[in-house]
Amino acid sequence: MFDVKTVSLEWGGKTLTLETGRIARQADGAVLATYGETVVLCAVTAAKSVKEGQDFFPLTVHYQEKYSAAGRIPGGFFKRERGATEKETLVSRLIDRPVRPLFPEGFYNEINVIAQVLSYDGETEPDIVAMIAASAALTISGVPFMGPIAAARVGFIEGEYVLNPKQDVALADGRLDLVVAATDTAVMMVESEAKELSEDEMLGAVLFAHDEIKKVIGAIIQLAEKAAKDPWDIDLSDNTADIKKKLKDLVGKDVAAAYKLTDKSARSNALNEARAKAKAAFAEEGAQTQMVAMKTMKKVEADIVRGAILKDGQRIDGRTTTQVRPIEAIVGFLPRTHGSSLFTRGETQAICTTTLGTKDAEQMIDGLEGLRYENFMLHYNFPPYSVGEVGRFGAPGRREVGHGKLAWRALHPVLPTKEEFPYTIRILSDITESNGSSSMATVCGGCLSMMDAGVPVKRPVSGIAMGLILEGDKFAVLSDILGDEDHLGDMDFKVAGTSEGITTMQMDIKVAGITREIFEVALRQASEGRAHILGEMTKALGEARTELSAHAPRIETLQIDKSKIRDVIGTGGKVIREIVATTGAKVDIDDEGLIKISSSDLTQIEAAKNWILGIVEEAEVGKIYKGKVVNIVDFGAFVNFMGGKDGLVHVSEMKNERVEKPTDVVKEGQDVYVKVLEIDQRGKVRLSMRVVDQETGAELEDTRPPREPREPRGDRGDRGDRGDRRGPRGDRGPRREGGDRGPRREGGDRPRRDRDDGPAPDHMPAFLKSDD
């Protein structure tokens, strides 16, 4: 029933198995990839014809994580997988970016690549497995895919490169989380987060990954030899030479003149005029010819721009290849935000704000590994007005999610620990102008806004986007590329970092032939550019502010003994709710006894802190505390102090002079200062008010004269003056001998008095005297 084909190899200490022929047999290509106990199914389908009038390549990649893969049921009301999560969107982009350039120009058939995680072992990251499965499925599908590619994750732990570590382990135990996708001969994509690694260390990691990737590519080729379908028979020959020549003759000079205009709007208008002129020249041709002519027009523009850069080193806006556009940075220009910056580089501009919050503002993330919370968020928005266009404005798309995550990776390594800075941090970046490298503007502006908010970052971070023009043996690396240079170039290479090293690197390469020499030149040139940008940022703000904004919440942390946690929380949360309701501060306590008290009002924090300290601390003899009278009795008043302790102020300790009644001095609910005089063995606390200034709480000198010592009882003489005190027995008469009581009965009871013994004694109640 099944014609199953399988290949396996040992890779990174685990077995990687690629299988086809058992599942999803109606797809053009389907591969089940197993690595460890993580299993990913990837299926590829392709439309057999091109939609009429279509002039682009509609490749769609979907990556989905099934909760059942980890033995979990989705949380929330709807118990099924919903729309793509941020992680699923990012992995979809990871698959798309290295695959898209490997389809031939002019191939416009729609292709769907769907990767689903079916099993997850908690150790092997499924994104790498999905990228390998997608490449294998495309390779055996028969579509004109010029692969295969493969992918690998690299960590840098204790000075050694490690293949395919778990993602969180890579950064917890090491300094690097790097994903590389490549063909057998060329690196196609790099995505990374690093803890200030040097350029050489980053380059070494990329080359290490490429060597390991080649092993997987060999396995994919083996699978294709066993199971690949016949390649599609399509005509992709370039028959546009005549059209291209006609366009160059017609509008070549107009295009060259347009690209010499340094202003983006003026340049765009001039190019649109040239395109309209070209379109008019083919107005009498058929619709297909017109479409081909306009596609060829883009090639004409690319040839003119690329030729000028390679031949003369002349860029679109007149800069040299290493020159960075003018930069202006402003901080604190939004009065009510916790931190803000306006970062402008040429015609790219970002408004960045930083907002500080408490623990309850953390982002809840539900995934295969369970529920977790993230205390650092960065959200990137790209409205259509930023490029002078009319377009959709609403929920973020894949591009916005990807750019935001890139900036997040750049800034995350320099954040303080939760212990150093217990705030939730959210950076919002709104791109207000864009002409290249808006994600790196977000890095620079986001860093400045955090510093303006008082976030103690380790070091400032700057970022730069690099480009590449490659023609044969000639190449030019461009610093701080424009949008047009990005579209017309062969590489988009973004690097961010501090003065000490790289924190993130992202690379998308559109052509083969990127050599180590080109990598080294690009990294060196990027380092120089980052240093220049960092200098410009320092002019606006050199280091993080030492004070938080007046509008930001304050958080104080308090560590208590674990045994005291239940005392602070109370039965059913009664105590902690009372603290919050009374003081107005937020109080969070974790299982380790770390308490976070937060409020925008410092007096509320202080009140809650003192309350908690009163619960967990022991009173000290001789120390003065502020308390509240909670009960008044005849002999004194009970005072509650340290939040949860009561002590007695005896009436004699209220004032130095005599006090008749405690209510003459205090009343219930009154705040008083008390000094601890004594704590007995049972924990009872004796307090004094008279030795404390009730206005200031300062200790007073005890001015009460000491009591005169009593005469010792042994010196009271023979006490003869007291007389004989009513004689030997006074009026009671002589003590009876007891004989008239009679002997006790056997049961120990006295004999009952006989009525004939005489009249009842006078002291007896009347009802006992009665004879009735």
Swiss-Prot record:
Q: What class of enzyme is it?
A: transferase
Q: Where in the cell is it found?
A: Cytoplasm
Describe the location of the S1 motif domain by residue ranges.
Answer: 622-690
List the Gene Ontology MF annotations in alphabetical order: 3'-5'-RNA exonuclease activity; magnesium ion binding; polyribonucleotide nucleotidyltransferase activity; RNA binding
Query: Region Disordered: what ranges?
Result: 695-772
Domain of life assignment: Bacteria
What are its GO cellular component terms? cytosol
Sorted alphabetically, which CDD domains does this protein's record hold?
KH-I_PNPase (cd02393), RNase_PH_PNPase_1 (cd11363), RNase_PH_PNPase_2 (cd11364), S1_PNPase (cd04472)
Catalysed conversion reaction:
RNA(n+1) + phosphate = RNA(n) + a ribonucleoside 5'-diphosphate
Q: Where is the composition biased (Basic and acidic residues)?
A: 701-760
Keywords, ordered alphabetically: Cytoplasm, Magnesium, Metal-binding, Nucleotidyltransferase, RNA-binding, Transferase
Q: Where is the KH domain?
A: 553-612
Name what cofactor the protein needs.
Answer: Mg(2+)
InterPro entries on file: ExoRNase_PH_dom1, ExoRNase_PH_dom2, ExoRNase_PH_dom2_sf, KH_dom, KH_dom_type_1, KH_dom_type_1_sf, NA-bd_OB-fold, PNPase
Q: Which PROSITE patterns match?
A: KH_TYPE_1, S1
What PANTHER family does the database record attribute to this sequence? POLYRIBONUCLEOTIDE NUCLEOTIDYLTRANSFERASE (PTHR11252), POLYRIBONUCLEOTIDE NUCLEOTIDYLTRANSFERASE 1, MITOCHONDRIAL (PTHR11252:SF0)
**Function, please?**
Involved in mRNA degradation. Catalyzes the phosphorolysis of single-stranded polyribonucleotides processively in the 3'- to 5'-direction.
Q: Which family does it belong to?
A: Belongs to the polyribonucleotide nucleotidyltransferase family.
Name the UniProt record assigns to this protein:
Polyribonucleotide nucleotidyltransferase
Record organism = Novosphingobium aromaticivorans (strain ATCC 700278 / DSM 12444 / CCUG 56034 / CIP 105152 / NBRC 16084 / F199)
